[in-house]
Swiss-Prot record:
InterPro entries in the record: Herpes_glycopE_Fc (IPR003404), Ig-like_dom_sf (IPR036179), Ig-like_fold (IPR013783)
Quaternary assembly: Interacts with gI.
Motif Internalization motif boundaries: 154-157
PTM section of the record: Phosphorylated on serines within the acidic cluster. Phosphorylation determines whether endocytosed viral gE traffics to the trans-Golgi network or recycles to the cell membrane.
Localisation per UniProt entry: Virion membrane; Host cell membrane; Host cell junction; Host Golgi apparatus membrane
UniProt feature coiled coil, ranges: none
Family the entry assigns: Belongs to the alphaherpesvirinae glycoprotein E family.
Location of the region described as Disordered in the Swiss-Prot/TrEMBL record: 176-210, 223-245
Name of the molecule in the record: Envelope glycoprotein E
Amino acid sequence: GSTWPSRCHSTLLGDRPHFIQPAPNRVDLLFKDIPESATGLYVFVLLYNGHPEAWTYTLLSTANHFMNVLTDRTRPRLGEHFYTDHGHQLFTPHPSEATTQELGAWTRHYLAFLLIIICTCAALLIALVVWGCILYIRSNRKPYEVLNPFETVYTSVPSNDPTDEVLVFERLASDSDDSFDSSSDEELELPQPPPAAQLQPYSSLESADASRGRSGFKVWFRDTPEASPEPLHRPTPPVGPDYSKVASKLRSILK
């Protein structure tokens, strides 16, 4: 076990110097009253039945004055040789002194380079964030179209033909209107308008027609106009009062 030296009563130190004494725990060794001549390397071997089981060593120094070790961590200058043959003479190298100006210049260059790298990375990061925000806004923007409510819409070809003038009345007076006397109930005979002139096939209205009151639009007609297809469901004519007589009277009054 780990306590076998303390239980082994036959442990012998053998031929040992007088300044080496066993410790009270019978495991360690103590150096006591060491003379100046005892300086050297000591090797300790543990024997068990004449066979070595373990060993260790220690270096003992009895110098009255110890010198501190000088550690030089600076780089040697160009052309300096520390180990020079001086005829078996001990040469102690002296540490090179780094000037404050050289160290300050190197530090400034390093800090400037580091600052440039940081500024470049920050600018790239800001540009990336702005670009991402623009893409996000564009993706969420809904396209729309502004419609002009005042756009001109033509439902028919304009013309200045007096035969095309038709009065349309959206709302007329009722049959009980008192603005007409009893004699106005008689139907007024109006002359029929002259028939429209038949245009030749594929003829056009030239500038001469425009001088006679035409609008100037050129209209082409087919030789044999195609018949309109029969509607599937014919609309039923609305059933209501006939205002044709009233419209004729109003038209005669307006003329």
